[in-house]
């Protein structure tokens, strides 16, 4: 059977992201996907593309000026590759890297970071992490005080999503 990549709609909550990743990891079959996402006027989205027990890949979109709060993933090594736009990455001491299209950053587990979408156009990132986050590896995101922080929370600078009508990456 020929596998055909299809557009995947974004997950709009942290719970939905992890539910989809768990479901994808359970399939045990090859997965094909498109690097395609609707662009944003405001907010951010995550689209789980593929997952196994040991790895995940997501397409992330941030509106221009979008950001998140300083945090770490204590059980997950992960990397970002900028596909469109640009982002400034920060650690606890300040600026760590300014990245544009086709540039990336690797963050070992426990590394504190945050980033800010610096281009006028929306930021599109490919995020790959290992291992797949699961409830037994809780908490999966912590703030600088070591306290759990939810990805789609006000504390993590989450705002409501507004899509750009008819505008897509990929």
Predicted features, each with a name:
Residues 47-51, 60, 69-74, 91, ...:
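Short histidine-centered beta-strand/loop micro-motifs
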Residues 1-56, 69, 140-170:
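A short, N-terminal "cap"/entry segment at the start of jelly-roll beta-barrel domains
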Residues 93-110:
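Short acidic-glycine-tyrosine-enriched beta hairpin
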Residues 70-71, 89-90, 107, 113-119, ...:
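Short beta-strand His + acidic residue motifs that chelate non-heme Fe in jelly-roll/DSBH
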Residues 79, 106, 120-139:
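A short hydrophobic beta-strand segment most commonly corresponding to one strand
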Residues 61-63, 72-89, 128-131:
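Short, conserved beta-strand element in jelly-roll/cupin
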């Amino acid at each position: 059977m020929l596998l055909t990549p299809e557009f995947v709609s974004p997950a709009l909550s942290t719970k939905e992201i992890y539910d989809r990743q768990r479901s994808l990891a359970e399939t045990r079959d090859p997965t094909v996907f498109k690097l395609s996402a609707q662009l944003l006027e405001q907010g951010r989205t995550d689209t789980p593309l593929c997952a196994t027990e040991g790895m995940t890949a997501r397409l992330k979109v941030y509106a221009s000026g979008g950001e998140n709060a300083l945090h770490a993933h204590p059980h997950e090594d992960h990397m970002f590759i900028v596909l469109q736009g640009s982002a400034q990455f920060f650690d606890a001491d300040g600026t760590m890297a300014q990245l544009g299209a086709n540039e990336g950053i690797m963050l070992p587990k426990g590394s504190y970071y945050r980033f800010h979408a610096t281009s006028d156009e929306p930021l599109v990132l490919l995020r790959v992490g290992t291992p797949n986050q699961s409830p037994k590896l809780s908490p999966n995101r912590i703030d600088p005080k070591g306290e759990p922080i939810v990805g789609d929370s006000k504390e993590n600078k989450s705002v409501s999503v507004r899509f750009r009508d008819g505008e897509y990456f990929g």
